[in-house]
Amino acid sequence: MHVVQVHSNTNRRTKMSNSLALRRRTFLNFGLLGAAVSAALPVKAFAQAPANVSFIAPTADNPIRINFNENALGMSPSAQAAARDAVAKGNRYAKAEITQLHTKLCDMYNVPKNFLLLTDGSSEGIRALLGAYSRLPKVQLVIPELTYGDGEHFANLYNVPVVKVPMLADWKVDVAGLKKAVDGFDGFSIVYFVNPNNPTSTVTPASEIELWVKSKPDNTLFIADEAYAEYVSDPNFKSIANLIQDGLDNVVLLKTFSKFYAMAGMRVGFAVGAPAIIKMMKDQVAGEKLNYPGVTAALVSLDDEPFQEYSRASNLESRKILASCFDKLGAKYLPSSTNFMFFELNEPIHAFQKKMAARNILVGRPFPPAMNWCRISLGTPQEMAYVANELTKMRAEGVF
């Protein structure tokens, strides 16, 4: 019995030693990767890197925030400077700058001026559309079961019934299921889809969407929320904008500066669609009365191509770090086309959230029905190296 006990203690010491060695190796591997990534990114492509690009170990008061799909780099230095300068003009309305932004976006999307409306982020666009079409005598909102929640939120606010279509395997959007829900309804249908989808980060191929939109089903409006399109490299993705440019009047595109351009707190977005749709939306908003710093930052951000290149490269490297971690841990995750990733847990998301928060890392909220999955936003490469180390330690400790 004594020999067995000694053997057991020896095993425990060996396992503990192996675990500590694994954690040390992992920390060095991911830490060196984060440092190498930082050095490799095209920082010199612009005059000055964002002030918050350096990494500081998280604390309870200053956690790693990878829960809201924010761009951890912050706005480009030139956009920050423009916003600071605009504060001094805060006693004035930004009428000229708003007109400039409106015109610039119309030129970018090759549409007349009455095809576009500036909004306070894309959320105001969703609200305006639901508010406008809720006045119809019989209307429904059709959405994938697992998607961004603002569509459902505003539908409930305006008493619009919501039809949720179950997802396919690996949380793919069931376009045929959405179509069936529309075909079986004798009123007006609003089809809201996010592409790439949130929280899954996956692309719904253009081939599955365009034919349906082009068929112009009666009493149907398509809302395409492309908040993350700037990150996409998947050849199966194509913006719905080309259908609007071709003259289709049953679809509206929603865009935001919150994600790729790192302007979540500035609240600048826009909608592109046929004049009749844009006019209905205008009646639901307080005009294009955006804040001065936000408008000027948006104008500068659109022209700052070096920073856009840097932002894409940083996001790609952060994605590689997290994917590598998941691969090493054997965790199932979906392919990412955005600035976040969706992976499967071996426990409910609420429990995992608490464990990560105890390590001063904030991760995504629950997304029913995927209650054993977690959405992690992609921070800086240095942040993701830290997160990868923590996940590896948690797995070694048996708590993840």
Regions found by a protein language model. Give the residues of each.
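N-terminal secretory signal peptides and thylakoid transit peptides that target proteins
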Residues: 7-35
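Active-site pre-lysine segment of PLP-dependent enzymes
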Residues: 175-186, 199-222, 226-258
